[in-house]
C-alpha cells in the first residue's frame, strides 16, 4: 500500500507503520479524533495534490482547472445537500481557518465577539485572548450555570451590555446540546449576527441526532473530520447570498491562497459517505455508546460535568480530587486509553494541568464497538483512576484492552 514510500524513506515509512499499530492497539477516545473512510484517504493521496487552482470553479487564475472545477462543484453540491442549505464554501483548510474567514468577512478590526468561555467548553477561535480573534477583535464570553449547562440568561445580559457584532454558539468541550433558537433570539435582541460552530457535532447534526443550526444561524462553520469522519479540513455554510459572497472573498484572496484540491476531493467523498443510511446508524451508535460510558462512570461515583452527556463527549470533573487532568491523561494513556486533559467549569489548575479530562465515543464507534465494550471501558477507566499511581495495574489493563482492540481493527486491510 506504500511501496514508493518504503523504498525512498524507510524511516518515515516505519514511523507511519508504528502509528498504524498504535491506532489499532490503543483505544482512541479523544473527542475531536476519528478514523476517516479508506476512500477519503485514497482521494487525499491522489494526483490532485499536484494541481494549483486559485479562485473558484469557472473563475480560476490558473489554466488546466476544468477537472478540478467539477470536483469542487461536486463537493459544494454535496455539502449543500447534506446540511440542507443554499451556499457552501469547501476551501477552508481547517475549522480555525473557517472561523477566521467568517470574522474577516463580517467584522471590522476591533468589532465585538461574544463566544463561550474557554474553560466552560469554548474554542480558542471564539475570542480567547491568546488567539488571533482575541487580538484583532474585542472579545467577551458567556459561561455555564453551576449545573454545567449554558447560562442563556447570562449570555443575554452580556450581549445587551456589550452589543457584540457577532455571537458564536458552539464548543470544543461541552457535553450538552446547543439551543440555536435561544441564541438567535439573543442575537436578534441586540442586532448581532449568529455564527454556529458545529465542528464537533456536525455528524450528529446531519443525521438528526443533534439540533440543526439552520434556520437560526446566519452562518455555520465546521470541520470535516471529527464526527463527520471526512478529511482534516474546514467548511462554511449559509443561506444568505450576500454573506456567501463575503465568505468567498474572505477565504480567497482574504485569508488563503491556493485551495488543497486533494482535500476538497476527499471532502466530496466524505460527504457522499455521510449521505448514506449507514452513517445514520453510526451517529446513533456514537450517542448511545456515550450514554453507556457515562452511566458506567456515574455508577462508580465519578463526577461528570453537567451530570452526563447529550452528544458524543463527556467531561470528567476532578476539582475535588488530589490528582489532575494531566495525571489522569497520563495514567489512562499508560493503560492504552487515549484521552485529553481539559479545563472544566470552575477550573482552579493551570491550563497545562487542568482539573478534568474530555472523552469521546466517535472513533471507537467507527471501529464497531458497542454497549458491551463501552461498559468494559468505563469500568477500566474507573479502576485506573481509583488507583492512579498503580503502574502495574495500568500495564495489565493495557494488555487486556489491547486484546479487545485487536478484535475491532481500524481498517480491514493494511492501509496508510
Curated annotation (Swiss-Prot):
GO cellular component: cytosol
PTM sites of type N6-(pyridoxal phosphate)lysine: 226
InterPro entries (alphabetical): PyrdxlP-dep_Trfase, PyrdxlP-dep_Trfase_major, PyrdxlP-dep_Trfase_small, Ser_HO-MeTrfase, Ser_HO-MeTrfase-like, Ser_HO-MeTrfase_PLP_BS, SHMT-like_dom
GO biological process annotation, one example: tetrahydrofolate interconversion
Keywords assigned by UniProt, alphabetized: Amino-acid biosynthesis, Cytoplasm, One-carbon metabolism, Pyridoxal phosphate, Transferase
Enzyme class, spelled out: transferase
Enzyme Commission code: 2.1.2.1
Catalytic reaction list: (6R)-5,10-methylene-5,6,7,8-tetrahydrofolate + glycine + H2O = (6S)-5,6,7,8-tetrahydrofolate + L-serine
Residue numbers marked as site, Plays an important role in substrate specificity: 225
PROSITE patterns in alphabetical order: SHMT
Molecular-function annotations in GO: glycine hydroxymethyltransferase activity; pyridoxal phosphate binding
Keyword Oxidoreductase: no
Residue numbers binding (6S)-5,6,7,8-tetrahydrofolate: 118, 122-124, 242
Cofactor(s) named in the record: pyridoxal 5'-phosphate
Family that this chain belongs to: Belongs to the SHMT family.
Subunit structure: Homodimer.
Protein name: Serine hydroxymethyltransferase
Amino acid at each position: 500500500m506504500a511501496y514508493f514510500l518504503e523504498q525512498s524513506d524507510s524511516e518515515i515509512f516505519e514511523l507511519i507503520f508504528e502509528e498504524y499499530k498504535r491506532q489499532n492497539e490503543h483505544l482512541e477516545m479523544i473527542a475531536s479524533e476519528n478514523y476517516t473512510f479508506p476512500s477519503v484517504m485514497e482521494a487525499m493521496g491522489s494526483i490532485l495534490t499536484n494541481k494549483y487552482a486559485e479562485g473558484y470553479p469557472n473563475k480560476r487564475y490558473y489554466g488546466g482547472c476544468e477537472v478540478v472545477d467539477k470536483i469542487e462543484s461536486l463537493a459544494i453540491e454535496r455539502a449543500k445537500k447534506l446540511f440542507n442549505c443554499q451556499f457552501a464554501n469547501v476551501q477552508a483548510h481547517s475549522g480555525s481557518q473557517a472561523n477566521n474567514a467568517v470574522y474577516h468577512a463580517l467584522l471590522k478590526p476591533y468589532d465585538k465577539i461574544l463566544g463561550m468561555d474557554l474553560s466552560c467548553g469554548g474554542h480558542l477561535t471564539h475570542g480567547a485572548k491568546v488567539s488571533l480573534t482575541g487580538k484583532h477583535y474585542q472579545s467577551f464570553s458567556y459561561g455555564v450555570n453551576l449545573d454545567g449547562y449554558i447560562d442563556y440568561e447570562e449570555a443575554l445580559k452580556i450581549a445587551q451590555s456589550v452589543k457584540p457584532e457577532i455571537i458564536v454558539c458552539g464548543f470544543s468541550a461541552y457535553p450538552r446540546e446547543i439551543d440555536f433558537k435561544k441564541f438567535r433570539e439573543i442575537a436578534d435582541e441586540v442586532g448581532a449576527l449568529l455564527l454556529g460552530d458545529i465542528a464537533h457535532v456536525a455528524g450528529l447534526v446531519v443525521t438528526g441526532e443533534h439540533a440543526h443550526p439552520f434556520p437560526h444561524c446566519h452562518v455555520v462553520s465546521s470541520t470535516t473530520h471529527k464526527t463527520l469522519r471526512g478529511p482534516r479540513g474546514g467548511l462554511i455554510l449559509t443561506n444568505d447570498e450576500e454573506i456567501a459572497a463575503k465568505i468567498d472573498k474572505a477565504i480567497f484572496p482574504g485569508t488563503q491562497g491556493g485551495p488543497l484540491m486533494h482535500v476538497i476531493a476527499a471532502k466530496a467523498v466524505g460527504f457522499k459517505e455521510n449521505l448514506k443510511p449507514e452513517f445514520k446508524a453510526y451517529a446513533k451508535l456514537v450517542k448511545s455508546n456515550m450514554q453507556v460510558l457515562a452511566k458506567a462512570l456515574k455508577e462508580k461515583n465519578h463526577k461528570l460535568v453537567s451530570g452526563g452527556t447529550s452528544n458524543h463527549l463527556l467531561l470528567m470533573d476532578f476539582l475535588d480530587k488530589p490528582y489532575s487532568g494531566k495525571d489522569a491523561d497520563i495514567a489512562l494513556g499508560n493503560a492504552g486509553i487515549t484521552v485529553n486533559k481539559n479545563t472544566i467549569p470552575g477550573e482552579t489548575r493551570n491550563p497545562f494541568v487542568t482539573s478534568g479530562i474530555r472523552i469521546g465515543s466517535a472513533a471507537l464507534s467507527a471501529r464497531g464497538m458497542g454497549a458491551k465494550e463501552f461498559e468494559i471501558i468505563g469500568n477500566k477507566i474507573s479502576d485506573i483512576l481509583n488507583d492512579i499511581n498503580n503502574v502495574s495495574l495500568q500495564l495489565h489493563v493495557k494488555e487486556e484492552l489491547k486484546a479487545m482492540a485487536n478484535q475491532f481493527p481500524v481498517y480491514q486491510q493494511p492501509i496508510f
